[in-house]
Amino acid sequence: MAEIKNYTLNFGPQHPAAHGVLRLVLELDGEVIQRADPHIGLLHRATEKLAESKTYIQSLPYMDRLDYVSMMSNEHAYCLAIEKLLGVDVPIRAQYIRVMFSEITRLLNHLMWLGAHGLDCGAMNMLIYCFREREVLFDMYEAVSGARMHAAYFRPGGVYRDLPESMSQYKVNKIRNAKAIDALNENRQGSLLDFIDDFVTKFPKLVDEYETLLTDNRIWKQRTVGVGVVSPERALNLGFTGPMLRGSGFAWDLRKQQPYEVYAQMDFDIPVGKTGDCYDRYLVRVAEMRQSNRIIKQCVDWLRVNSGPVITSNHKVAPPNRESMKSNMEELIHHFKLFTEGFHVPEGEAYAAVEHPKGEFGIYIVSDGANKPYRLKIRPPGFSHLAAMDEMSRGHMIADAVAVIGTMDIVFGEIDR
């Protein structure tokens, strides 16, 4: 009788559940995975090398394009690393704005993850629900930066501009009549803070809707409970961070353990899982959305009553405002020098990490005293998570590999860099 051998299956890179350009070479015994070999590099754009030939400010928009679902969180780590080397103090109002937008970014990321993960596992309506809320969050991005995705809003020394006092309005068009437009503009009558406050008030009920659809759903539980189990010790050894580590029962969060900006003043909890499977990681991320909502509310309340500058007054690092630039020769020179030559960073090295929605996102900069980094190293959270793909999917069915990829929340912009 002929010997029955394992066969090889290529999963991706064109597969819709591959979350980008993942190529998995699966060794299968029937439908059971014996080995999973992830092939990466299909979205490699040499970001680290490009940064060596650009000034510090010119490299900032590259950060948005790493994890292109959590744009401002990438910028945050980059700015913190530069500020460490420069020794620049960030105004307190700018710190609150940064924290608020970092948490808005966390909501954007987790909503994208929840919609895509649900879709991968067969819960198609989740994507529609989640994108409904993402649309509102993108409007917040657009209000401060003019861009809905690649904002480039955080700058070394603060943020690009203060929060606007008015929101853009929808106008009557061929698709919607005046009544529909009035309904859309109902929460856009005040400032951006009013708009955010309105969203924060409604959001907990919307999260309840997601939980109604999934948390006790029998099919969802069958697809996620007991799949991709990782023990706390193994999660640490594999280099897991963020929800992947907390889902295994390890309460590690940089916002609590190594607070940066104004996180030390914020009141929030760290959701932690028990069993370390896909279902636990789902519960952790949903609970994180509720905590992010709490943080945003605290920032909104503080920003309402406290005014002040939003970027450092050191014009060798941050540009002067337009009014003074047009009337003062010295300010014009500062502006010109900053956007042609850039600022020179003192010799040294610095590592700054933030609690990115996916885990610990770190930027390591080595400076030789020039206006460009000598070396820039990006520490993406998804890289070490994807490395555990083989271990997490071994012994499971092909359909479970989709659930494992979904629970990792991987984006190839940051993995391939």
From Swiss-Prot:
One of its GO terms (molecular function) is quinone binding. It holds the Pfam family Complex1_49kDa. It is a peripheral membrane protein. It catalyses: a quinone + NADH + 5 H(+)(in) = a quinol + NAD(+) + 4 H(+)(out). Keywords: Cell inner membrane, Cell membrane, Membrane, NAD, Quinone, Translocase, Transport, Ubiquinone. NDH-1 shuttles electrons from NADH, via FMN and iron-sulfur (Fe-S) centers, to quinones in the respiratory chain. The immediate electron acceptor for the enzyme in this species is believed to be ubiquinone. Couples the redox reaction to proton translocation (for every two electrons transferred, four hydrogen ions are translocated across the cytoplasmic membrane), and thus conserves the redox energy in a proton gradient. Belongs to the complex I 49 kDa subunit family. One of its GO terms (cellular component) is plasma membrane. The keyword Heme does not apply. It is found in: Cell inner membrane. It comes from Polaromonas naphthalenivorans (strain CJ2). The gene is nuoD. InterPro entries: NADH_Q_OxRdtase_suD, NADH_UbQ_OxRdtase_49kDa_CS, NDH1_su_D/H, NiFe-Hase_large. It is an enzyme of class 7 (translocase). Its main location: membrane. This is NADH-quinone oxidoreductase subunit D. NCBIfam families: NuoD, PRK06075.1. Its EC number is 7.1.1.-. The keyword NAD applies. It comes from the Bacteria. NDH-1 is composed of 14 different subunits. Subunits NuoB, C, D, E, F, and G constitute the peripheral sector of the complex.
